Structure formats: structure tokens, C-alpha cells
Amino acid sequence: MIERGKFRSLTLINWNGFFARTFDLDELVTTLSGGNGAGKSTTMAAFVTALIPDLTLLHFRNTTEAGATSGSRDKGLHGKLKAGVCYSMLDTINSRHQRVVVGVRLQQVAGRDRKVDIKPFAIQGLPMSVQPTQLVTETLSERQARVLPLNELKDKLEAMEGVQFKQFNSITDYHSLMFDLGIIARRLRSASDRSKFYRLIEASLYGGISSAITRSLRDYLLPENSGVRKAFQDMEAALRENRMTLEAIRVTQSDRDLFKHLISEATNYVAADYMRHANERRVHLDKALEFRRELHTSRQQLAAEQYKHVDMARELAEHNGAEGDLEADYQAASDHLNLVQTALRQQEKIERYEADLDELQIRLEEQNEVVAEAIERQEENEARAEAAELEVDELKSQLADYQQALDVQQTRAIQYNQAIAALNRAKELCHLPDLTADSAAEWLETFQAKELEATEKMLSLEQKMSMAQTAHSQFEQAYQLVVAINGPLARNEAWDVARELLREGVDQRHLAEQVQPLRMRLSELEQRLREQQEAERLLADFCKRQGKNFDIDELEALHQELEARIASLSDSVSNAREERMTLRQEQEQLQSRIQSLMRRAPVWLAAQNSLNQLSEQCGEEFSSSQDVTEYLQQLLEREREAIVERDEVGARKNAVDEEIERLSQPGGSEDQRLNALAERFGGVLLSEIYDDVSLEDAPYFSALYGPSRHAIVVPDLSQVTEHLEGLTDCPEDLYLIEGDPQSFDDSVFSVDELEKAVVVKIADRQWRYSRFPEVPLFGRAARESRIESLHAEREVLSERFATLSFDVQKTQRLHQAFSRFIGSHLAVAFESDPEAEIRQLNSRRVELERALSNHENDNQQQRIQFEQAKEGVTALNRILPRLNLLADDSLADRVDEIRERLDEAQEAARFVQQFGNQLAKLEPIVSVLQSDPEQFEQLKEDYAYSQQMQRDARQQAFALTEVVQRRAHFSYSDSAEMLSGNSDLNEKLRERLEQAEAERTRAREALRGHAAQLSQYNQVLASLKSSYDTKKELLNDLQRELQDIGVRADSGAEERARIRRDELHAQLSNNRSRRNQLEKALTFCEAEMDNLTRKLRKLERDYFEMREQVVTAKAGWCAVMRMVKDNGVERRLHRRELAYLSADDLRSMSDKALGALRLAVADNEHLRDVLRMSEDPKRPERKIQFFVAVYQHLRERIRQDIIRTDDPVEAIEQMEIELSRLTEELTSREQKLAISSRSVANIIRKTIQREQNRIRMLNQGLQNVSFGQVNSVRLNVNVRETHAMLLDVLSEQHEQHQDLFNSNRLTFSEALAKLYQRLNPQIDMGQRTPQTIGEELLDYRNYLEMEVEVNRGSDGWLRAESGALSTGEAIGTGMSILVMVVQSWEDESRRLRGKDISPCRLLFLDEAARLDARSIATLFELCERLQMQLIIAAPENISPEKGTTYKLVRKVFQNTEHVHVVGLRGFAPQLPETLPGSDEAPSQAS
């Protein structure tokens, strides 16, 4: 058996009353006896201080401090020490017989706080002969010694061979060594563990039932199921970490998206501005060169325009001088034409008026005759009307006598009266008062003859009148014609003047007949003269344009020379046109090709970027599309190989995970069904019984039990038989072993151990040979070792799987990139570089432009020469036909001569035209001018008198005729008297009156009508006379005006005047047109010169500004380029495809990216400030700084342990691959890590069952413990009802609450807490979080209720409380509980330390005088049975029969206080028999 470690001695150095004292400790009970103040408590305080050197826990209370809320300021330690270095050392020997001295160096710290400095240390390998006091003291003399400080102690021990000295800086390391060497029973990992240990020591020191321990019995007695708890914590931590990692991945993905967005927008923002500045710099350079070329061209154009301006100004001056003369000539010609037109119009008017006068003369004569006839008819009508009136009057007078009209008599009477009236009227008219009816006939003949005579006379006079009137009219006409031709003259001169005019008319008519031939001749000569003048002008212009005077004889030769030159220049111009057309076609083709290439360039550049990225990613160079497709095939093959290897590694990793999961099952069960069967059979798995077997013993026990290592140990096999019937849900081979699970051993088999193997004799005729497994899995230590190796393997496999997954995803992404490249860019990626071709074409275009410019200049000169030669030929073509005119010098004289003759002829023609009609009219009647018919008025009066006489004679004859006709009526004189009342006569008279009145009415109407007609005839006659007189006056005026005009108006005069005017107008128009052209050209030339001057100034200004801008921008651009190259971002910023975008597009792109960046960096102060600074358009380098800052910002956030690159873009690509792999792996891991609620319930139940069994074993050791009336002590362990219900729900009804356990938002602990709250809504959880509650529910100790019960007297079993027990009973019961705790700790910690070490057991009891002798004897027996050491402090009542007793007496000698110690070993005889379960016999008294 393994010997238990023991405390050999306690050494106090420089304590109050103890300078150098060593107390040898008994193997069982050491008693410190002495009076008050003897040093018992100091001694035990030194022991406790060396055991637990934690100033936060140490507090040595005096009994006088009972009820005090706080002790002394030094907590009882400072006052127990003396000044200087103090030591408290424990000399121990462990189960391995190793001597270990542990202790502390104490030293008071000066100050009012009364602090103590403690330094723990340990000494190993010290020989048994060396006493602790010899180590720490140095003898100065026989009665003097010195305490060594810690450093000297260290030096002293290091000088001793084989001795190890360790000084500890932490209490945890100190206690860890003590636990490993078997000095303390439990590993004290934390301050909480130290506190529990101290409370245990303190409870034993002061005795009684400690409320601090009884309230926390679960923490003291029930070991923390660290494996299960750690598994749950690891699972939750792994799940939490998994979910946090997934969340971090999602955040990282969003960060990645943000990074991609940031780098994309930053690249767009800066690259667009970078390329815009690059484009602008190139554009500015091109503009500067263009400005320089335009400046040179403009200067040349300005000089040419100045020369042109001088020539045009000179020509304009000449045309301005000629224009005045032409305007005067034209105005004269226009005036002459107007005069001719006026004269012609006057002549036309004169002729028209003369014709009108002739017509009016004829009409006037006709109208005179009509008027004369109308007058005669008027007179007849008047006579007839008068007769009708007379008859009416007569009838009315006759009718007045009504009686006469009554019968015939009345009629006759009326006739008679009428006859009388007619007779009276005839008397009156004929002036014959003696006229009678009888003499009427005679007188009628007389008067008829008289009428006839008067008529004849009137006709004679009328004839004479007519003849006189004709003669008078002819004379007046002839006289008026002479007056009209010659002007006013005497009537007697008319004849001579008329004859002279007729002779002159003949001469003028002869001259007038020559007008037309002369005019034609003059027109011909004038035309020749004008042609001669035109030829002279053309010759002068030609000479001026040619800049040389030519003779007429030289013109033909010059014409031939110019035609030859035209032919030559025409060929040159034609060839030049063809050449220019060829050059322009080539230029257009180049331009079209350049445009096509510029459209293709961005696509090609994008393809090249993609190809370069692929080349960088795969490290290969591709020269053709075939290389790409071949590499893609290789990539596919590599991807398949990587996938196969990844799947193999993944399968192996899954197998390792499954094995880890299987080995991690509680109790070592690899099959969950075994746990259920063990619970059903009421047994325990064999693996659980051997769960604490060491790693060294695991191969042996694994081989010992062989296939039955997974057996179920049951108390009674006979009770299991009934359960085996119909059992199907079990492994193929189920082993059952009968035995007590609490005291099971390996004696069931007969076994022989061989080298790395065993032979198990199962029966007489059946042996089993089993070799030790290379990887044992029997026992928790073996499983944990295997799990550790599996975890290591899993880490390697996980790393390899991650690497392969990364490679696969990288390969897949590379394959996708290749596929995208093949689909999008393969067709153009391997074509020729369009930019290089564009550069070649641009250089060729420049050459073509230069050739075109030179060609245009040459062609312009040739064209100018051609135009000049052509103009010269044209001028000569117009001049050469007129060479004879140019040689005719007498043409102008002949024109003047003919013009004079024509003037005379025209004058004659005008005279003939003016007076020709008058002369023609005068010629036949000129003879009437010889005599003047002045008696015409007398004849006219005689004619009128003759007409009146003829009219009177006619009336007289008519009246006499009426008398003669009524001559019979004169015989009715008697009837007039007789038939005055006759009615018939009256009626006849009335009828006759009516007829007479009707006749009178007709006569009146005829008279009125004829009078109106006569009036009209007279009006027409007056109108004709008035028109004739008016036109006569107008004709005279027109003739005078025509004479005043002084122009001969013949038929061709107007045409000649118009032709002359039109020719002059054409010349003037041509001159003006040319002058206007010259003025416009001059104005245009001046404007062009002004424009050229302004353009020249502007070009000079723009050129110098542009050159300055280029020079200025060059420095900034150099700085930008230097910054770009220094930071290695040129590849990112110099995006050549952007060079083909316009500045507005690039600015828009940059502005859009700027807006996105403002939002993206809103939370980053540094980037926000750098971005704000980069917005200055005058500082482009700040944008580069911003881009570098973004890159630096992203580089700082690259996980170098995951992504090994400094390029954020590549990091983002790798991040996408890694995040995708991690997401997939963590999702799979989360599914594997998740644990079912039934498994949790089974684990907790198994743990509770195991701990209940262990508590029962502890209770067995306390059955015979008695103190006073207390006959026995036990621990009662029960499962709480609420927690039992939780376990039932977890194992049986978990499907109803899967909403909690399947939630990704809740951890398993939180889901468990939610379920607990759901099942127990009445319980107030307080302020604790679900996570805290869930972690408590995962600890099986919280499911149990523990309390201490004592069997006291007649009360039976009751709860152990201080108030129900006496002091001694309470002390004894508390000591029993403490012993159970220590034993529980040892059991819990057995697997943590070496199997060959049994730890020391030691408790304290201060003021043991409260126990009686029997209780003290019980303590002695308990210590002996449990191999426990006990230190008791009592005044005097402890008899030194057993153990070792020290008598302490405090003395004062020469002002020096010390404690006198006397030791006595026990002398009681040996007991006849030992207590049950004791390992050794009690020591003999000495």
C-alpha cells in the first residue's frame, strides 16, 4: 500500500516568543498545551501561514473578537512577529519518501498599516540530518545566533550539493508544487480554491459547524465536473466562437465589400483624376504645339493679307476714281434717255392730240349739220304744236257753246266758228285784214308763190352760206396751220409764209429721210468706238495685272505663251488634285482606322488587364489563345486532383472528429445504447469504474478485459435476465459482469502478465491472449491522451484541409476567371496592340498632314498662277478680236461727223414730225390764203333772215290753206245759231276735242322730246367745241414744250439712248460691283487682318500661358509621378482604357466616386480628413496621398496570418476565397459541435448518479462516528424537483422545445435557461442573464441539495445545526464534516497527481477544552482510522496518553520574552483492535 505523506515538523524563526523553535509533529495527534498566552495560537498561526501564505485570507481572530465586524488592523499576524526576518517552515515527507521543506519568509513592513511581507519558498533534496533551524540561523556565539535573510539562505542552499531551493512569486505556483508533492490534498488553481481551503482550515481551527462550509457543501464535497463542464464550455465557446467567427466573417464580408467598394471607388476617384490630368497634360502639350504652329501660320497669313490689302487698296482707289466719271456719264445718259422718252411721249401726245383735233373737227362739222336739222324739225314741231293748241282752243270754244254741239247744226256752227277762227288767224298771219273766204284761194296762190320764193331764196342763201362757211373754214384752217407752224403773223402774210413753209418742209422731209441710215451708221460707229474704248480699257487692265506694258503686236505671241502655260498648269493642277485626293483618301482611311482602333483599344486594354491578372495569378505567360485553353485544361486537372485530395483529407478529418466525439462521451462509452442499458439494468459501465485508471495502466486493463471492456457491471445478474428477453436495441455483443460497482476489482479473472500482453484464463478450457494496445482507450487518461493526439492530428488535417480548400477555391476562382476571360476577352486579347498601331498611324497622319500642307501651298501657288494665266488668256481673248479697232485712230472723228449729220437729220425729222401733218393739210388749201372771206357774217345774217321769212311764208300759206279748206264751213253760219243746243253736235265736239287734245299732247311730247334732243345736240356741239378748243390749246402747249426740250424724238432715239445708258450702267455696275467687291474684300481683309492680329495676340498669349502652364504642371506632375512610383500604385492608377474617355466623363466618374467615398469614409476621421484635403483641384498629389492612405489603411487591416500579401486588391481576392472556405467550414463545424438536449440530460444524470454513489461511500466512513449524544453523522443528497423536471423534459419532451435549441441566436446555455424559465415561471431569476443561468444549469452540483444530518439520541436523524447540538457535539460533527471534505478532495484530485502519492492529511482544533474525554478519544480514533494528523490546542485537560504533547509556558527573562516548550510522546497501551478501515496500528507510547 502507498504510505500517506506526513508533516514531520513545524519550525518558527523569530516569532513572538519563539526565536528558533521546531515542533516535531506526531503522525496522528499533536497537542499544544499551555495557559493563556502561552503561544498555542501563535504556533498554529505559523503553521497556517506556511500552509496558506495569502494575506487576503489570513485573519487570526482572538476569542475576544467574537461578534466584532472587523478584527485588529494587522489581522493577528503582524503582532505575532518580531522585528527582522521571520520564518515559518513545514518539514514534510511524502509517499515517495521525499523530504520537502516548505515555508515562508515574513518581515514586518514599517508603517502604521502594520503590513507584513511574505515570500514563499521550498527546499527539496535536503538530507535528513539537517534540521530546519540550522538552515535559517547562523550561530554567532554560544548564546548568540543570527537569522539569515532569504538571499543568504538561497546562497547557502545552493552551496549544498543535491539541494534545490525555489522561491515563488505567486501563491498559485507555491500551492501547485505542494499539490504535486503531496503536501496538500487539492490543487488550488485560483483565489476561490484558496479561499475554500482557508475556510476549511479556519473551520477546523475554531471548531464547530461552520456555516460557511455547510451552506456550500456542494462546492466542498461535490467535485466540479471539469470534464463535462469543460466539454460544455468548450462546446459553447466553440459554438460561440464559431458564431462569432461567422458573424465576424459576415462583418468581414461586409468589410470586404466595404474594402472592395472603398478600393474601387478610391481607384475610380484617383485614377479618373490621374488619367484626366495625364490626358490634360498631353492635351496641353498638343495645344502648346498647335498654338505654336498656328502662331507661325497666322504670322504668315497676316503678312500675306497685308500684301493683299495693299494691292486691293490701290485697285480700289483706281475704281473710285473711275466711278465718278462713269456716274457722270451714266447720269447724262439717263438724263438724255429721260429727255428722249419725254420728247417721245410729247410727240406721241402731239400726234394723239392732232388726231383728236382732226376727229373733233369732223365731228364738229357733222354736229353742226345735225343741230341745223334739229332746229328745223324743232320749228316744225313748234308750228304743229301751235296749230294743235289752236285747234284745241277752238274746239274748246266751240264746245263751250253746248247748244251748238247738240246737233249737226251745232257741228256746223263749230265748223263755222273754226273756219272763222282760221280766217282770223290767216288775216293776222298774212296781215290781210280784208281777207275773206272767197279771196282766200287767190291769196293762197300768192302766198304759196311767196313761200316758194322765200324757200328758193333761203336755199340759195344756204348754199352761199355753205360755200362761204367752207371758204371761211379753209382759210381759218390754213391760217391756223401757218400760225401753228410759223407762229403768230398777220392774215395778209399768211400766203407768203405758207409757201415758204411748204418749200422748207420739202427740204426737211428730205433730211428726215436720212435719219435712219445715219442713225444706223452712227450706231455702228459708236459700237465700234465703244469696243475700241473697251479694248483699250481691257488692254490697260491686262497690262496692269500683268505688271508690264505690251504692244499690240506682242499680244498674239503672249496669248500663245499663256495658253501653253495654262495647259501646263492645268495638268499640274489636275495631277495635284488627284494627288491631294489620294492623300486625303489615305488620311480619311487613317482617321477611320484610328477611330476604329480607338474604339477597340479600351476592349483590348481590358482584355490585357484581365490577361495580366491571370498571368499574375497563375505565374504563367500566355502568347496565344491556345496557351490559355491548354492551361485551362491543366487547371481543370489540377482542380480535380486538389478536390480529390481535399475530399480524402476531409474524410479523414471527419473520421477523426467522429472518433473524438466518440471518445469524448462521458464514462468512456462508445455506444450511447450502453448508457441506456446500464441505466435500465441499474448497473454501471465498466469503463466508468476504471475511468480514473492512469495512462500507464490503461494498456494493461484494456488487454485484461479485452472485448468486455465495454461491459456493464450489475449487482446481481439474476435480476437482469428478465430485461434481456426481447432486447434488440443493443450492440451485437453485450457483456454483463456481476459485482459491486462501488468496490469492484479485477479479481474476476485469472491472469498472467506477459511482455506487453496478458493471458486471461476465462475458464479451464478457454484462455484469451491479448496484447497491450498501442493506443489504449481504456480510462479517462488514455482517452484524453488519445483525444489530444487526435486533436493534434485534427489540427494538422484541418490546416491541410484549409490549405487544400483554399487551393481548390483559388483554383476554381482562377478557372472562373479563365472562363470569363475566354468568354469576354479571348477574341481580342492576342490581337496586335492597337495603341502601338495608333501611334504609327498618328505619325503617318502627321506626315500626311505635313505633306498635305506643303501640297496645298504648292497647289495654291500653281492655282494662283493658273488663275492669273487664265485671266490673262480671257482678257486677251477679249482683246485680240479688237486689235483692228485698237489700230483705227480715225474712228472717233468719223463718229463725230456722223453724229453732227445725224443731229441735223434728226432736227429735220423732228420738224417734219412736228409740222408734217400741218404742212400736209396746208398744202391742198394753201390757195385759200390768197383772199380773206370777211362777208361771212353778213351772209350768215341774211341766211337767218331768209330762214325766218321762209318760215313766216310757210305759216301764212298754211293758215290760208286752212281757210281754203274750211271755205265750205263759212256757209254754216246759220247752223251755228240754230243748233247751239243740239246734243249730237256736243258729242262730236267733245270727240273732236279729245282728238285735238291727244294730237296736242303728241305734238307737245314730240316738241319736248325734240327740244331735249336739240338740247343734247347743242350740248354735244358745245362739248365738242370745248374739247376742240382745249385740245387745241394743249397741242400748242405740247408743241412749245417739245421745242423747249430740244431733243429730236425719232423712232430709234430712245433705243440708242437706252443702249447707251445701259452700257454706261453696266460699266458703272461693274465698276461698283468691283469696287464693292474690293471694299468688301478690303473690309474682309482688314477684318481678317484685325482678326489675325487679335488671333495672333491671343495665340501668343495662349501659347505663352499654355507653355507656362505646361512648365508649371510639369513640376507638379513630376511630383505626382514620383509619389506614384515611390508607393507602387502606378499600375492601379494608370488605367490606359480611361485615356479614351473625355474630360467630362472622367470628371463625372471622379465626382461620383467622391460622393460614394464621402459616405464610405464618414466613420474614419483620418481618411475623411485626407479625402477632404484631396478635393483641392489645384493639388492633384493630395489625391495620390489619399489613395496611398486608403491602401495603407487596408494594408493595416490585412490579417497577415491568414493572407500573406501587402496588396489590398490581392488581399480582397484571397479574403473572398478564405471567407468562403471559412463560412463553409464553420457552418459544418457548428452542426458537428451542436449537442442534443437528451445527451445533456444523460450526462448530468450520470454525473449525479456517480456523485450520489460517492457520497454514500463517504457516509459509510462516518457511520461509527459519535460525539456525546450524536450517534452517527451522514450527508443527505437529493435532486431538486424543478431541476429533475428540467432533466425529464430534456430527455423525453425535448421535441416540444426545439425552437429554443435550434435557434442560431441562442447558445445552448441560453436555450437551457429559457427552457428552465418556461418550465418554472414562478421562480424569479433576478438580474442574472440567461447565459449565467444556463451555465449554472450545466453544472450538475446545482441540481443537488445537500445537508448534514446527525442521529442524536431519541430525536433520530435531524439536520445538523449548531443550535440543536452542544458545543462538543457541534465541534465533533464539524470535524467529521471536514474530514469528509478532505477525503472528497483527495478522491477528486487523485487523477490529477501521480498514483504513487497519497497526500498529507492535517486538521487543527484550537480551544479543545470544550470537548470531553470521550469526544477527544473519538477524534483520536478518527485520526488513526483515516491516517490524519491533528493539531490540538488545549489548556490542561488533554491527557498526554496518545500522540505527542507540547507544554508551552511563556516566560520573561531579562526583559526578553520567550516560550518554554516541553514535549512528551504518548504512553497509552495499544488497543486490542483497530477501528474499521484503519491502515496502521496506533503508535506506541514512549
Swiss-Prot record:
Principal subcellular localisation of the protein: cytoplasm
Tell me, which GO biological process terms does this entry list? cell division; chromosome condensation; chromosome segregation; DNA replication
Q: Outline the segment boundaries, as ranges, of region: Flexible hinge.
A: 666-783
Recall the taxonomic lineage recorded for the source organism: Bacteria, Pseudomonadati, Pseudomonadota, Gammaproteobacteria, Enterobacterales
Q: Which InterPro entries match?
A: MukB, MukB/SMC, MukB_hinge, MukB_hinge_sf, MukB_N_dom, P-loop_NTPase
Coiled-coil residue windows = 326-418, 444-480, 509-603, 835-923, 977-1115, 1209-1266
Per the record, its GO cellular-component terms are: cytoplasm; nucleoid
Q: Write one Gene Ontology MF term.
A: ATP binding
UniProt: ATP binding residues: 34-41
State the protein's name: Chromosome partition protein MukB
Query: Which family does the similarity line name?
Result: Belongs to the SMC family. MukB subfamily.
Quaternary data: Homodimerization via its hinge domain. Binds to DNA via its C-terminal region. Interacts, and probably forms a ternary complex, with MukE and MukF via its C-terminal region. The complex formation is stimulated by calcium or magnesium. Interacts with tubulin-related protein FtsZ.
Q: Name one Pfam family in it.
A: MukB
**Briefly, what is this protein's role?**
Plays a central role in chromosome condensation, segregation and cell cycle progression. Functions as a homodimer, which is essential for chromosome partition. Involved in negative DNA supercoiling in vivo, and by this means organize and compact chromosomes. May achieve or facilitate chromosome segregation by condensation DNA from both sides of a centrally located replisome during cell division.
- Keywords on this record? ATP-binding, Cell cycle, Cell division, Chromosome partition, Coiled coil, Cytoplasm, DNA condensation, DNA-binding, Nucleotide-binding
